[in-house]
Amino acid sequence: MKVSVLGPAGSYSEIAAKSLFSVICSRTAPHIFFTSSIENAVLRLFENDENGETANFAVIPVENSIEGAVGVSMDLLLEKDVCIVAELILPISHCLFVSKETAHLSGFSLDQIQTVYSHPQGIFQCRSFISSRLPISETVETDSTSKAAKIVAAINPAEKICAAIASEAAGKEYDLEALHFNIQSIPNNSTRFVLVMRSDSRKMTQKVNGSDFYMLPEYFSQTGSGSVFYKTSLAITPKNDRPGALFQILEAFNNFKINLTRIESRPSKRVLGEYFFFIDFEGNPSDSNCAQALSLVFERSASVKILGTYGRILPDRQ
């Protein structure tokens, strides 16, 4: 099983990928492909690497409890021919690391740290700690938190004293010294990751108004041990030639007592003021109420893209 994630090793995306497969497909350990960006992780589903290999799956972050939606991921779900097959909510715990050489310097203290490296979200999520404990340090953004850890591991403290904000896994991967744990400003920090694959690789199980809905691959349900319930994700463009268009779409879910778990807007990038709406709801199209609600949604929308019907791994099984 080949899975592409944002790297390098020790990233939260890698942690999410391993956690997902340990629950939904415990007999198959994934082979992780590390990429330099979220976009490249998805492109690996379609493009060969230097060894002529493509990935079967990609794991990407779509939403953080502090920062909200991950825009690049939402755009990729909309633009690429992929579907969601599972999701996982991963608790995010940031740590402050320095190299062991730095930690063992005589008289070393936080005041000596000149530069702090991390992903932009890592920096933002730890802004209170940075402002209070590292007020004179420069912050430098990296492609991922694990990339920050890798950079710090390679810097000679004789040249510059620097630190990284990253996961415990990244600290272990690059043999760094942890100075502080759980430095995020809000303790209940979590990120929603989704497992995606090419739509043409899925086994189609049902059509609604001519659009394909995809269920979990058979080997997930055969080997899985996690407690799951189904969710369905859509990307919708309302009809903009009449008032109350979005209300009428949402009314369809309310009429059939369908619980919505997320509504998120995203610019269409075509015309100012035109938006796609990402909608997640509990259930799958084989349920009578869901099927009837979806029929109305199709009637009342200018366009509907099915992003997937999939299992959500419950927190008590992670």
Report each predicted region and the residues it spans:
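Domain-level signature for soluble enzymes in the chorismate/prephenate branch of the shikimate pathway
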Residues: 1-318
